Amino acid sequence: MDLTKNPTCIESLDPVLQGGFPSGSLVLLLGEIGAGEFEFAISSIARLLNRPKQDTCTLFPNKVCYISLTRGKDDVMKEIAFSFPEFYNMIKDRLEFKDLSEAFFARSFIPINWRCSLQTELSFDSLKWDKEEENLIVALIDYLDKKAYGSIVIIDSLTVLAKHCLERMEWKDLIMFLRGLQKASKKWDGLVYTMLSEGIFEKNKQEEIQDCMDGVMVFEWDKQGS
């Protein structure tokens, strides 16, 4: 039985978790808009990458993968640079970034010069759909199967993914996908974080999403004095 854990490297949190999340966990970062779920994920991986490998009961990732469904790498890295200047150089050299925004925006009305990188020249070939653009879910599954083993993965975000899926499938199919993702995460033996904005879905549906997870962390604005 594998009892290793993935620490968050947040000093106030790991003792509560008795060392961290069990390896193979799918963890939902559920938060009000801008309440800190992104900052938690980045702070955690930065501290983990900077931590000496000493504890044999602690699992250190093979790699850290950031999967973005709508934002390009430069956009995300700029936010990290502003929010965590002390960690930026270390993260940029060790973070494997996967941009699935082309798949997300494919066949939408968004003009190609908006969704493509500045380096992309408009041509006949650039207007063709590649395999990754044809199906966002298939592209995500394929990437996870190749990269998630022993890794920490951040999926940005479940809010975007769920809304995209529900335009193409029923609610029960989305829940089935999430349960499959939770099961697959055990095989990958790493840690998968995914972010969901509070209040996007009805309360019972949000709770159904939470039920698919191994753990849920809730981020809220301090309402003291309001």
Where are the predicted features?
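Pre-Walker A adenine-sensing motif
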Residues: 7-21
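Phosphate-binding P-loop
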Residues: 17-24, 56-59
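Short hydrophobic/aromatic beta-strand immediately N-terminal to the Walker A/P-loop
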Residues: 26-30
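Conserved P-loop
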Residues: 32-121
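Substrate-engagement module of ASCE P-loop NTPases
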Residues: 50-51, 140, 172-199
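Conserved nucleotide-binding/hydrolysis micro-motifs of P-loop NTPases
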Residues: 70-74, 102-105, 159-160, 198-202, ...
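Phosphate-binding/switch loop-helix module in NTP-utilizing enzymes
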Residues: 103-182
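Phosphate-binding/switch region of NTP-binding enzymes
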Residues: 183, 190-226
